[in-house]
Amino acid sequence: MNGAVCVLSALIAVFTCFSCRPAVQDERAVRIAVFVPGFRHDSPVYAMLCDGVERAVTQERATGRSIGLDIIEAGPNQALWREKLAHLAAEQRYRLIVSSNPALPHVLEPILRQFPLQRFLVLDAYAPQEHSLITFRYNQWEQAYLAGHLSALVSASAMRFANADKKIGLIAGQSYPVMTQTIIPAFLAGARAVDPAFEVDVRVVGNWYDAAKSADLARILFHEGVDVMMPICGGANQGVLAAARELGFYVSWFDDNGYARAPGYVVGSSVMEQERLAYEQTLRCIRGELPSAGAWTLGVKDGYVRFIEEDPLYLQTVPEPIRVRQSALLRRIQSGELTLPVR
């Protein structure tokens, strides 16, 4: 860690004389960097981020615009993120650096001060006080509440793998504020809206890639009576899916459409429209319409948090009475009849 700090300090010293003036750019030429704090294909969130930015760039290139795009996969070692972001900012080549992770506003704090003219867009994060930083967060209380509600409906049903225990599970990659303060309590609240007796058993992998460990944790939960589990552990999600097929339990998927990942086992997909948001905000950047700073929260009523209920695999796997109750909850949130916390 001390080495990373020294490297960052050296970078800042070298580029101090350049940090207060913008890079020279052709008015029509745009260059964008996507900073992936992990690996693109290990995480639905990062895959959607890259897909959305690429779609916007491809669309605008078709009109004759000169647009450069660099996608940098930084890996899961958070200790290196600040150093790598400082390198990008110091290059003074990018109109916008785009990323996605709740921890990034904190990581960016010294870089924003040193390079105030470099604009950053971070999705799935919230930082209302920072200059030159634009953040959008999804209302993950709504997202996790929907997932918990569906999980409890399935657990309390007569479906093949359901049991009599009032217990559902969540396997997280790591423990972090959004997980402990929003996702877990909202997941539990959604379940208890079905039956106040429900409990949530939470296990933590310790990283975002160890599928063998997540599978072991899923086996432990299964043998303790958990019949529906929600994995939020990046590439390690695959271990939970493998255990579900091996043992016979259900999976509630988070972030993107997961029904096809394990047909017959994935019973719900509570998603955030990350690809759409990345596409829209990248277009705004290219067209010169993106503000210099700001923080926004988007939820069900905005159309950026959804529960996917039209997928044929959902219709085939989940009985109609459960689908009707889940749909009724979704409509109550959409209409404003049910107001959930904004977090």
Swiss-Prot record:
<feature type="lipid moiety-binding region" description="N-palmitoyl cysteine">
    <location>
        <position position="20"/>
    </location>
</feature>
<keyword id="KW-0564">Palmitate</keyword>
<keyword id="KW-1003">Cell membrane</keyword>
<comment type="subunit">
    <text>Monomer in solution. The complex is probably composed of two ATP-binding proteins (RfuB), two transmembrane proteins (RfuC and RfuD) and a solute-binding protein (RfuA).</text>
</comment>
<keyword id="KW-0472">Membrane</keyword>
<dbReference type="InterPro" id="IPR050957">
    <property type="entry name" value="BMP_lipoprotein"/>
</dbReference>
<feature type="lipid moiety-binding region" description="S-diacylglycerol cysteine">
    <location>
        <position position="20"/>
    </location>
</feature>
<protein>
    <recommendedName>
        <fullName>ABC transporter riboflavin-binding protein RfuA</fullName>
    </recommendedName>
</protein>
<keyword id="KW-0449">Lipoprotein</keyword>
<feature type="binding site">
    <location>
        <position position="140"/>
    </location>
    <ligand>
        <name>riboflavin</name>
    </ligand>
</feature>
<comment type="similarity">
    <text>Belongs to the BMP lipoprotein family.</text>
</comment>
<dbReference type="InterPro" id="IPR003760">
    <property type="entry name" value="PnrA-like"/>
</dbReference>
<dbReference type="Pfam" id="PF02608">
    <property type="entry name" value="Bmp"/>
</dbReference>
<dbReference type="InterPro" id="IPR028082">
    <property type="entry name" value="Peripla_BP_I"/>
</dbReference>
<keyword id="KW-0813">Transport</keyword>
<feature type="binding site">
    <location>
        <position position="208"/>
    </location>
    <ligand>
        <name>riboflavin</name>
    </ligand>
</feature>
<feature type="binding site">
    <location>
        <position position="255"/>
    </location>
    <ligand>
        <name>riboflavin</name>
    </ligand>
</feature>
<keyword id="KW-0732">Signal</keyword>
<feature type="signal peptide">
    <location>
        <begin position="1"/>
        <end position="19"/>
    </location>
</feature>
<dbReference type="GO" id="GO:0005886">
    <property type="term" value="C:plasma membrane"/>
</dbReference>
<feature type="binding site">
    <location>
        <position position="176"/>
    </location>
    <ligand>
        <name>riboflavin</name>
    </ligand>
</feature>
<feature type="binding site">
    <location>
        <begin position="43"/>
        <end position="46"/>
    </location>
    <ligand>
        <name>riboflavin</name>
    </ligand>
</feature>
<comment type="function">
    <text>Probably part of the ABC transporter complex RfuABCD involved in riboflavin import. Binds riboflavin.</text>
</comment>
<feature type="binding site">
    <location>
        <position position="124"/>
    </location>
    <ligand>
        <name>riboflavin</name>
    </ligand>
</feature>
<keyword id="KW-0997">Cell inner membrane</keyword>
